[in-house]
Amino acid sequence: MLKVKSDFLTKDQVIYDVAIVGAGPAGIAAGIYGKRANLNLAIIEGSTPGGKVVKTNIVENYPGYKSITGPDLGLEMYNHLIDLEPTFFYANLIKLDKAADTFILYLDDKTVVFAKTVIYATGMLERKLGVAKEDHFYGKGISYCAICDGSLYKDQVVGVVGGGNSAIQEALYLASMAKTVHLIHRREGFRADETALNKLRNLPNVVFHLNYTVKELLGNNTLNGIVLQNTLDHSTKQIDLNCVFPYIGFESITKPVEHLNLKLDPQGFLITNEQMETSLKGLFAAGDCRSKHFRQIGTAINDGIIAVLTIRDVL
């Protein structure tokens, strides 16, 4: 009998072949391949299945779909998985332990899951601006999901911070409904897809603020403006607006495993071998939480498939 924390419930002592933490593209792909390989698996997800895909307006680089909304693609992935009838735990992982050859997963609904192996596919968290009152204005003028909250600001003035694909795609989406979109980027050059960037440049209601960062958030109960600072001459200017959408990068979600002393890269992402196994035997990482150069839907799916097929071969 495996011992667990006294305040957690153990409905049974089933030890799954693999527990998949996260139901984004990596976790869903691992689940589909795992079920088809006859593995007894559990999937743990406390948020909307689909990962960051469901927060994306339009996806135009996923094979088989010339253009599809992120929520629709995420739903199709999820339905494909659910049709295979995996065991699903709709909760968040708060801590992962290992006792001998068995992993113990503590969930925030006070249940516990046991597994021989784990695929950690938690994705990433949006990086915050790092300015005063950011948490205070969350939901009141600060949003990290344009497709979730953009319609609340129809015919209003909004800002998007960032210069990558996410920032440009969400600025395009917001420009279809907002009165004005202010695109704020800390440098001249962009890392975004040139086609999408050119579309944005040609829109009459988009204003570019290059070589600027957000220095201050203005307002009392709700956001009503921001102060920008020039990265070259440090001059400042104020913009009156109703909401800011930061898209300035992401951070790995490693708190549930931080006590395991896993190998991480300098940015805090999990280091794996080519089979997606971390420095702890039996613990695999897949998708955006893994240390790698490219983070795309396709690369996440690749990670999940490799991880679960490796597990199939070793169990």
Swiss-Prot record:
TM regions (residue ranges): none
Annotated compartments: Cytoplasm
Annotated binding of FAD, by residue: 45-52, 288-297
Alphabetical list of Pfam families matching this protein: Pyr_redox_2
The entry's keywords: Cytoplasm, Disulfide bond, FAD, Flavoprotein, NADP, Oxidoreductase, Redox-active center
Cofactor(s) required for function per UniProt: FAD
Classification via PROSITE patterns: PYRIDINE_REDOX_2
Alphabetical GO biological process terms: removal of superoxide radicals
Cofactor note: Binds 1 FAD per subunit.
Catalytic activity: [thioredoxin]-dithiol + NADP(+) = [thioredoxin]-disulfide + NADPH + H(+)
Molecular functions (GO terms): thioredoxin-disulfide reductase (NADPH) activity
InterPro entries named among the record's database cross-references: FAD/NAD-bd_sf, FAD/NAD-binding_dom, Ferredoxin-NADP_redctase_2, Pyr_nucl-diS_OxRdtase_2_AS, Thioredox_Rdtase
EC number(s) reported in the record: 1.8.1.9
GO cellular component term of the entry, any: cytoplasm
Cysteine pairings via disulfide bonds: C145-C148
Top-level taxon of the source organism: Bacteria
Main location: cytoplasm
Other remarks in the entry: The active site is a redox-active disulfide bond.
Family: Belongs to the class-II pyridine nucleotide-disulfide oxidoreductase family.
Subunit-level organization: Homodimer.
Protein name (record): Thioredoxin reductase
Lineage, highest ranks first: Bacteria, Bacillati, Mycoplasmatota, Mycoplasmoidales, Mycoplasmoidaceae
Gene name, Swiss-Prot/TrEMBL: trxB
